[in-house]
Swiss-Prot record:
One of its GO terms (biological process) is protein folding. GO terms for cellular component: cytoplasm. This is Urease accessory protein UreE. It holds the Pfam family UreE_N. Its main location: cytoplasm. One of its GO terms (molecular function) is unfolded protein binding. HAMAP family: UreE (MF_00822). InterPro entries: UreE, UreE_N, UreE_N_sf.
C-alpha cells in the first residue's frame, strides 16, 4: 500500500469528527522523530504490514496522530517514539542569553516553549548530548533529562559562515 497524503490528525480533530474514528481499530506506524521529515520512506505497522509513504513536496512533516489510511474497521496512524531531550530552564534573561549563545555556537538544534506550553515554564529543548549536559552542569543552568514526543521534529537549520 502506498500512502500519498495525510487524511488528518487525531489530536487536531474536533470532538464530533473524532467520534467517526472511535470504533476503528488503530494500527500504528511507529517512527522515531528523525523519520518524520522524510517524505518518501518504507515503514512497517505494528501488525507487520509494510507500507510506502510518498508525500507530495511541500506537504509538511509527519506528526504524532497523523491518519494515513482508513478502511472499513481499521485505520493506520503515526505514533512517534519519545526523544531523549534536555529541557533547559534558565532562571534569568542573562542566563538564557549566555546559554543560548554557548549552545548556538555548537549548531545545536533546539525548540523553544513558553510558560503556556506543556512544560509550564519558558524552556529550551534540545536533543540529549552528554557534552551539553556537562556544560549545563558546570554552568549551573537548571535542566532535566526527559523522554518527550515533540510537536515537531528537530530540523537542521541551513546557514553559512
Amino acid at each position: 500500500m502506498i500512502i500519498d497524503k495525510v487524511l488528518g490528525n487525531l489530536h487536531d480533530l474536533p470532538e464530533n469528527d473524532l467520534a467517526a474514528y472511535t470504533g476503528l481499530h488503530r494500527e500504528k506506524v511507529v517512527l522515531p522523530s528523525a523519520q518524520l521529515v522524510k517524505r518518501i520512506q518504507r515503514a512497517t505497522t505494528d501488525h507487520g504490514n509494510e507500507i510506502g509513504i510518498r508525500l507530495a513536496s511541500g506537504s509538511g512533516d509527519l506528526r504524532d496522530g497523523d491518519i494515513l489510511h482508513v478502511a472499513d474497521t481499521n485505520m493506520i496512524v503515526v505514533s512517534v517514539l519519545p526523544t531523549d531531550v534536555l529541557v533547559i530552564a534558565p532562571r534569568t534573561i542573562h542566563e538564557m542569553g549566555v546559554t543560548a549563545h554557548s549552545l548556538g555556537n555548537r549548531h545545536l538544534q533546539a525548540q523553544f516553549f513558553d510558560a503556556d506550553s506543556e512544560y509550564g515554564a519558558a524552556v529550551m529543548v534540545c536533543a540529549y548530548d552528554h557534552t551539553v549536559e556537562d556544560y549545563l552542569t558546570h554552568a549551573g543552568v537548571p535542566y532535566t533529562r526527559q523522554e518527550r514526543v515533540l510537536p515537531v521534529p528537530f530540523r537542521h537549520a541551513e546557514h553559512s559562515h
